[in-house]
């Protein structure tokens, strides 16, 4: 069986072959209006131009959704039109189709070099919920703070634990973030809390699911069977965490200032349709979850993930961890079904974070908290500078990457990168 090819040259190591076509929001120049495109090789295909040229047909014939400053309108159209759009774009970019391939004027209007455009947040994120769905991560953290005998809380194997995060401070890859201030307290007996910049700044390797389809009605749950039809696509997510602030504040309601100072997502949204060839079975769940969470078959995805760190002294990043979405105990569809089982309504553009994705080995842990085991050991940044870390320092850049390896092609997410700036000076 021949592999689908594009007339746009795509290198073997590209994250963006014609089998992928992730959606993003971009500006060709800073003064231009934002619009929607898909990535193909080293280029962005401008979907607003395709629409202006009347190259979409069917229900999308006169669409204006690709002229918008975010993907929300397109994501709200639902699975049928997502699939129709993908089929049309894939056909237009195919090496077998002459419409754009043989029209120089069209090509000059449609394609922009990825390196020349400004990428924006892909969606207007209304609500953000972060889960705690990796058994390895939850166990590691539990051992550190409660001991082996009480590592997992009793509820953990019965439901996907989550909390509501802050959508206003979600930023697109490449946006620097300042080290946050907050209250911390030492472990010394009779010590008092102090107000200071975070000393234990951490990353969390996560993925985020963007919700699509029509808004659900308040009081109507999304069933486990239909949950997949409400997920438009996935992004990489770094849920930055201030561990010392979190330790003092989290009882009894969970993290607050330790999380809401910033979360970084990748600009390209890889659709569920593109990911389907990489569907795989999740870990066996024991005990069997309640009926509303039960699902069969290949309900998660084999997505290889990595974390690299680049200090100001380094010329290139050094990989510190590799993991995989397939390790997650609770799947994205289970998370969505649980989120709505009480009738909570969902809107296009809502974001669900998986929680830290840790694997079974020490080199697959998804946070510095685990890699340094609560700061008890150092993490090497390689031989170029022989630097070491226990947590993230000022000037450090953290780069997340994700990749699905197919037969003759690969589907990637690009990078999710953020750099930590020094904290503001305060009295």
Curated annotation (Swiss-Prot):
Its cofactor is Ca(2+); Mg(2+). It comes from the Eukaryota. The keyword Magnesium applies. Its EC number is 3.7.1.2. It catalyses: 4-fumarylacetoacetate + H2O = acetoacetate + fumarate + H(+). Pathway: Amino-acid degradation; L-phenylalanine degradation; acetoacetate and fumarate from L-phenylalanine: step 6/6. Transmembrane segments: none annotated. Keywords: Calcium, Hydrolase, Magnesium, Metal-binding, Phenylalanine catabolism, Tyrosine catabolism. Gene3D superfamilies: Fumarylacetoacetase, N-terminal domain (2.30.30.230), Fumarylacetoacetase-like, C-terminal domain (3.90.850.10). GO terms for molecular function: fumarylacetoacetase activity; metal ion binding. Belongs to the FAH family. PANTHER family: FUMARYLACETOACETASE. This is Fumarylacetoacetase. It comes from Dictyostelium discoideum. The lineage of its organism: Eukaryota, Amoebozoa, Evosea, Eumycetozoa, Dictyostelia.
